[in-house]
Swiss-Prot record:
Top-level taxon of the source organism: Bacteria
Entry protein name: Fe(3+)-binding periplasmic protein
Organism field: Serratia marcescens
CDD domains: PBP2_Fbp (cd13543)
Known role: Part of the ABC transporter complex FbpABC (TC 3.A.1.10.1) involved in Fe(3+) ions import. This protein specifically binds Fe(3+) and is involved in its transmembrane transport.
């Protein structure tokens, strides 16, 4: 008995293949998107819950640190299972973008965020922001003794009087801004003086706790740590004050948290929709009401009323697309900080 191979006509074969392709596409969409997330988990969970409720698109989060996930994406390349990358700071976004791993974002999405909070090339976008701040214990340091600039912390009189977390992505982002603003030579000199003057702690929250307990007079961290603690019990921040350098000082640097869609994503439409949602009115409104206490960056969006308004911080103009994490690590290593 012979097999009948041509029982389906050309039209039927075409229809069959189209149905199979559509089914595979639908199955792929049903799986939702995978986000490599280095942002605060509670904030991103609020975003994910709102997005899924509105769109029905499922989201799987893989949480980690800026540098950890950024380097992982570079290593995985086009084979990465990630559809979206979210960070706390810009340098990790620059790392991934330099590896040519991001897809261009939709024009409508880019238009939702103020131009100063997104790179002009349009391959990633600001999703939130945080300000550098000098925290101090008024029992140890009077207002008259406060430094005029972040650069003053390199002076001999600050030896043993301030703290930071040099191994963290947050502080390294601050150094990356210093590098862009002042250049390699000045940055290395400041880092070497820092090595002599400061006390190292692991994590910004640990720096805050140490200042609060009077173990060290002051520290350089991001603004939201005391606000987050104050919204809970305040036990780790009740004894500290916040000082904003302003005057476009390197210490007034505002770091942009970034979001981007991987070019290798098999769920481009859904991934683009997620970035559009979190930078839109609903996503940015969550920043106003959520206890993450980060700044909203959307056009016309309001931040938490407890925060000093972004426009009043007088931050330096820094091109987030130029922040160089690799060079920062090299310089900090040379200075003996890593």
């Amino acid at each position: 008995m012979k097999l009948r191979i041509s029982s389906l006509g050309p039209v039927a074969l075409l229809a069959s293949s189209m149905m199979l392709a559509f089914g595979a596409q639908a199955a792929s969409a049903d799986q939702g998107i995978v986000i490599y997330n280095a942002q605060h988990e509670n904030l991103v969970k609020s975003w994910v819950d709102g997005f899924t409720k509105d769109t029905g698109i499922k989201v799987t989060l893989r949480n980690g640190g800026d540098s950890e996930l950024g380097n992982q994406l570079v290593q995985e390349g086009s084979a990465s299972p990630a559809d979206v990358f979210l960070t706390e700071n810009s340098p990790a976004m620059v790392l991934v973008d330099n590896a040519k791993l991001f897809a261009p974002l939709d024009a409508a999405t880019l238009a939702q965020v103020e131009p100063q909070y997104r790179p002009s090339h349009g391959r990633w976008i600001g999703i939130a922001a945080r300000s550098t701040v000098f925290v101090y214990n008024p029992a140890k340091l009077s207002d008259a003794q406060l430094p005029k600039s972040l650069l003053d912390l390199a002076k001999p009189e600050w030896k043993g009087r301030w703290a930071a977390s040099p191994s963290g992505a947050d502080f390294q982002a601050i150094v990356s801004a210093l590098l862009e603003l002042k250049g390699e030579k000045a940055t290395l000199a400041w880092l070497k003086a820092m090595k002599t003057n400061f006390t190292a702690y692991k994590g910004n929250s640990t720096v805050m706790k140490a200042v609060n307990a009077g173990q060290v007079d002051s520290g350089v961290i991001y603004h939201y740590y005391p606000f987050v603690d104050g919204a809970k019990t305040g036990e780790n921040s009740n004894n500290i004050k916040l000082y904003y350098f302003k005057h476009q000082d390197p210490g007034a640097f505002v770091s942009i948290s970034g979001g981007g869609v991987l070019a290798s994503s098999k769920h481009q439409q859904q991934a683009q929709a997620f970035i559009k949602w979190i930078t839109g009115k609903q996503g940015q409104e969550i920043l106003r009401t959520n206890n993450a206490f980060e700044y909203a960056v959307g056009v016309g969006a309001a931040s938490n009323p407890k925060l000093v308004p972004l426009k009043d911080l007088d931050a330096p103009k820094v091109d987030a697309a130029q922040l160089n994490s690799k060079k920062v690590v090299e310089l900090m290593t040379e200075a003996g900080l890593l």
